[in-house]
């Protein structure tokens, strides 16, 4: 929706992400048909055929990962153990009841976490844009391939507090833990671990001044 712009006079479509550098890789984006089982099977095969490409499949908001559950269970979670083949496919799964009713939470965190075993997959719930950038970058920088599942709540797309500094993108790497810089470290008596959208929910009920409770992002 926002990756492609169109020239009004010529109807030419321009992908800005393909205009960053002459030495960059190729960026393509497609609207896939609503056959999650077939589409995710194709993406799994594409990622296996070209392990140097960052292949990402985003489930539509509305519990549409259900239709692809066979691929997720039989291939993503267990493929390496059964067939000794690695795969670096990335899944963006919308998460959370965000005012749309019971059928609008594509990713049940507990279900995906229960399927983690023997280093078979990465499951992430990123809190900052920079951390999400670094985990995607790490996906290709690594010398091996593992599936990566990222929970992507829609409410964070335009949240005014979900920002990162430019230097956070340019430096460092993926952080497993992000400390709370608003806490008074000398007076902390309560430590709360949260991740993703829950961190920003917590901020609504805390004071902007240094406090005696620390909220650490996992």
What are these regions (language model features)?
Residues 85, 98-198:
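Active-site phosphate/pyrophosphate-binding segments
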Residues 1-52, 57-80, 168-178, 185-204:
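Non-catalytic terminal/interface segments that mediate subunit docking, oligomerization
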Residues 66-68, 74-97, 114:
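Catalytic or ion-translocation cores adjacent to nucleophile or general acid/base/metal-coordination motifs
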Residues 205-210:
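Conserved small/polar residues in nucleotide/adenosyl-binding loops
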Residues 59-63, 93-98, 129-130:
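Acidic, glycine-rich active-site loops and adjacent beta-strand->loop/helix elements
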Residues 216-218:
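Hydrophobic alpha-helical segments, chiefly the membrane-spanning helices
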Residues 18-25, 49-55, 87-95, 111-119:
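Short acidic (Asp/Glu) and glycine-rich catalytic loops that position anionic groups and cofactors
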């Amino acid at each position: 929706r926002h990756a492609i712009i169109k020239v009004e006079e010529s109807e030419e479509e321009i992908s800005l992400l393909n205009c960053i550098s002459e030495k960059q890789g190729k960026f393509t984006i497609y609207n896939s048909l609503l056959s999650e089982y077939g589409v995710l099977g194709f993406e799994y095969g594409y990622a296996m055929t070209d392990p140097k490409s960052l292949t990402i499949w985003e489930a539509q908001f509305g519990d549409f990962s259900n239709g692809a559950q066979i691929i997720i269970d039989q291939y993503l979670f267990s493929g390496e153990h059964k067939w000794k083949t690695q795969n670096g496919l990335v899944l963006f799964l919308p998460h959370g009841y965000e005012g749309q009713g019971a059928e609008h939470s594509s990713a049940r965190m507990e279900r995906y976490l229960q399927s983690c075993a023997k280093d078979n997959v990465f499951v992430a719930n990123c809190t900052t844009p920079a951390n999400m950038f670094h985990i995607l970058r790490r996906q290709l920088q690594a010398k091996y391939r593992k599936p990566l599942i990222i929970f992507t709540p829609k409410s964070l797309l335009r949240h005014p507090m979900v920002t990162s500094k430019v230097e956070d993108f340019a430096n460092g790497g993926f952080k497993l833990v992000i400390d709370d810089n608003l806490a008074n470290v000398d007076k902390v008596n309560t430590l709360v671990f949260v991740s993703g959208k829950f961190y920003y929910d917590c901020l609504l009920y805390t004071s902007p001044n240094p406090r005696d409770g620390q909220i650490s992002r996992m």
